[in-house]
Amino acid sequence: LNADEDQRLEISKRAEATQNQIIDLCRVLIKGGSWTEIKVILAGLKTEQPESIRRVVLGYCQAILLKSQNDRAAMIIEEFWDPTYDIGFPYIVYACYSITNKK
């Protein structure tokens, strides 16, 4: 990187904040949170790579399933199964909305 130390630190902080937002999304999806909660988190993720979001959600739910049976985690994996390359962020929004309506 050609960035100075302060710039690298700022980039690192932004990446960590994004990762935390995606994990927050995962937690809300697993607990069966409301669409109101989810859309606030999604608004903060709108500029992020949709495929990165999808893969974190899949990994989070996979980790839950490998520990114990969890039908909700399996359902979330099913909703996030397809790659987002052709559709982008609207796919993430639709998947989250669909999950909130399958309580």
Language model segments and positions:
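AAA+ P-loop NTPase domains with strong preference for DNA replication initiators
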Residues: 1-103
